[in-house]
């Protein structure tokens, strides 16, 4: 009689682990990955402390910290290859890998050490790309489609991809293809009233898709329906935690530093994922993003920079603001020394929906504060994405990059897996 083990009791497995993390402002970095099996139940309580590197001056602005946990099924990455792989079982062709470069830190954005083989599983890299493309780039930006990590620039491979600034008038413009006008061909002697209404309807549905429905699930929700994350191979956001990292100023205590002070930021946090049932094999990604509010030294309120104001500019007339097309302005309209050739589009009246931060000119010549010193340049995408080098001058040292965190991931997974003893005692 054979005593081959053909199953296992569902038991809790403690997958708790530590993380000693370092990252850059505005870049999305993976801080933990857990492979999961169909039928698992995954739960996590992460407890840690986040620190900014020592500041050169007193603490001026709190930073905002976002921590996310996503579930990415392997089928979303490998497609039909995964289905065939599972059907073929032990006779299946091994799953593909992707290539990294030879540096130890060129897979750090995925939360792993780069192996000696310079190859990592495809689902790690493609899973990260899927998360970034669906949740962290502006919808009008092109998807990141690199096939291998060795195609990335060094900053992306080490620190993660650049993310958008927190929203304001110049960091969250309308899509660049936004129409400022639309022509309708008519007869020279008459206007087709019904055709005019049809043109309005076409414009309305086009604008809805341009601004609010660039993804399939958004389109379906506009009809009153609902799609699962599986419909468009979208990673499932399981949990998000948001906090503001604050700190304190430290006064000098010895003779050489007496009277001097510098900022220190240490913020404890907790990120809890309630028990989540895993429907099929995949990976649980936990990622972190630290950002300063976009505070620019030369930013000006739009009405103050415009000069002679028209009725439309200043009246706040709801009839006009509700019916006028978007307005195209330039960086010069919201920044001193801004480039008038760098255009972007905003909704009419947007200057009444937003107030810029003000930085006294006394700060302008001082380094050490988390301010954007010069008007952002480059194309629209370059201006919207955070440049972490803008903040290098804030820190005394960046040996542990611009922020670091020490965290305990308390992870419990309930899964059907033989015990270690059962695996040792083969048959």
UniProtKB/Swiss-Prot annotation:
Molecular function (Gene Ontology), one example: structural molecule activity
SUPFAM superfamilies to which the protein is assigned, alphabetical: ssDNA viruses (SSF88645)
Keyword Cell membrane belongs to the record: no
Disulfide-bonded cysteines: none
Protein's cellular compartments: Virion
Family, per entry: Belongs to the microviridae F protein family.
The protein's role, per its UniProt record: Assembles to form an icosahedral capsid with a T=1 symmetry, about 30 nm in diameter, and consisting of 60 capsid proteins F. Upon virus binding to host cell, one of the spikes dissociates from the capsid and the virus interacts with LPS through the exposed EF loops on the F proteins. After the genome had been ejected, the channel formed by the F proteins at the unique fivefold axis remains open.
This protein's name: Capsid protein F
Protein source organism: Enterobacteria phage phiX174
